[in-house]
Amino acid sequence: MKELAAELRKYKQVFVVCDRNVEGFAREVTGLRTDGRSGEPGGLLAITADEAHKTIDTVMQICRWLLEMGADREALVLAVGGGVTTDMAGFAASIYKRGIRYANVPTTLLSMVDAGIGGKTGVNLDGFKNLLGVIRQPEFTAIFPEALQTLPEKEFRSGLAEMLKTFIIKNPSHAYERTVAEGPLPELIQMAAGIKQEIVEKDEFEAGMRRKLNLGHTWGHAIEWRLPGAYSHGEAVAIGMVQAARYAERFGIAEEEGLAARIGKDLKACGLPTELPCPVSELLPAIAKDKKAQNGQIRLVLPVRIGKVVVKKVDPSTL
């Protein structure tokens, strides 16, 4: 926490936007003051950070608060919370006064290994996931593993799914197998975050290899649209990863025999769902609107073995 305090002192104004569920933690890690003293947080806004509130209205609430608080273009917005919080606070910072700086203090496993890294910010539009947003890199991301001690089990599993996704894409030192067997050890969390950061640095605007990070998300986002609130993001992505592996086998590109069965078994062992909760036909409207779609085709990220995925263009009607 001393390192974070030292980092914050570099900024003239710091405004904290946090998930109301972690307001106490946000005050603790920032040493929040309200006297406007240089280098100290100038105020805190606690928001409802769930998918139902991940909208442009909440982003406008944040922007209006920044305006009322007198935030200028030298200010820093510090997002403290999970992926919904970092997405919305980052988006607000990206458009307020044509862009001010922001940083992340992720408090969920998912945001530590995925959402809090890489600069993707945004909100949902009419229930469709992340259709509004920009890519803007945070000044820094500060990870405090102790924040996970009070994380609800459902959210813990959600982040575990994203960790496993990362290691299906790239699997150094058998990180995938270790995560299944031992859980998200701090060194594995750092490894997953490092893999994502490495990919982002090579392809910030998702023109190529960064698309691989969308493994499981084509079906996952569609499930979240079709059954809002029924599954956490990570749970929906887990189902999507099994579907992706099945399609890799169907297209004859899987290099590992029984890949889909293996991934399904491992995800189940981690307490994650693996089967579609509805017919694919009910998911097609969302799949067709997927932000990766282009010229009537979607880009599916398909695992061919643990540690390797490919991107394949397909017609949604073939799913």
Segments the model singles out, each with a brief description of its role:
Residues 1-76:
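ATP/NTP phosphate-donor binding region
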Residues 91-180:
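A glycine/threonine-rich phosphate-anchoring loop and its flanking beta-alpha core
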Residues 68-71, 137-153, 161-169, 173, ...:
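Generic secondary-structure signature for well-ordered alpha-helical cores
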Residues 63-80, 87-104:
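Non-catalytic interfacial helical region
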Residues 15, 161-163, 254-319:
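C-terminal charged capping/lid subdomain of soluble metabolic enzymes
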Residues 180-281:
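Active-site segments that bind and position negatively charged phosphate/pyrophosphate groups
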Residues 84-91, 112, 222:
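Short glycine/serine/threonine-rich phosphate/pyrophosphate-binding segments
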